[in-house]
Regions:
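Conserved ABC ATPase "signature" region
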Residues: 32-52
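ABC ATPase nucleotide-binding domains
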Residues: 157-163
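ABC-family ATPase nucleotide-binding domain "signature/switch" substructure
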Residues: 3, 8, 16-21, 37-40, ...
Length: 163
């Protein structure tokens, strides 16, 4: 099973529980599972919600910050207990502080789930075990971040000054 956290998450004008259990729409929601996924996704704003997981989030999650929306996306992806969790530019729309919070959340999941992270921000992949530098569909280099990222940065720097 694969869980997916997109760059732009769509939230329903529904409760937090319904948004987390979105993949099981129409079925009975496992509230204990929703709470466990919220905990795993470091959703720390549950106590601030007037009706806990039953609080309606508003159209596209208007009552939440960008970082909170992404955490709901992570909880949603975790609800089906995936073997692999795919993050597709999941932090690109966030400011630095929110990105750091989400990075901490992602790091906490590394021990229990295989993570595949697609990102342009180098800080997003700096803690990964293996980094693949892909250009035009080809793997240019792979290895530990400490090996691949400096070479990638040097190439970016060189191409910026050769224009």
């Amino acid at each position: 099973k694969i869980g997916y956290v997109p760059q732009n998450l769509y939230l329903l004008d529904a409760s937090l529980a319904e948004n987390v259990a979105f993949s099981q729409w129409g079925k009975t929601i496992d509230e204990a599972r929703v709470k466990k996924c919220c905990q795993m996704a470091a959703i720390d704003f549950l106590a601030d919600l007037p009706e806990d997981i039953h609080t309606v989030l508003g159209e596209r999650g208007v009552r939440l910050s960008g970082g909170q929306v992404q955490r709901v996306g992570i909880a949603r992806a975790l609800y089906d207990n995936p073997d692999l969790l795919l993050f597709d530019e999941a932090t690109s729309a966030l400011d630095g502080a929110a990105e750091n919070e989400i990075q901490t959340t992602i790091s906490s999941l590394r021990s229990s789930i295989t993570l595949l992270i697609i990102a342009h921000r180098l800080s997003t992949v700096a803690e990964c075990d293996i980094v693949y530098w892909i250009d035009k569909g080809r793997i240019i280099r792979s290895g530990a971040p400490g090996e691949v990222l400096p070479e990638y940065e040097a190439t970016l720097h060189q191409s910026a000054f050769s224009r």
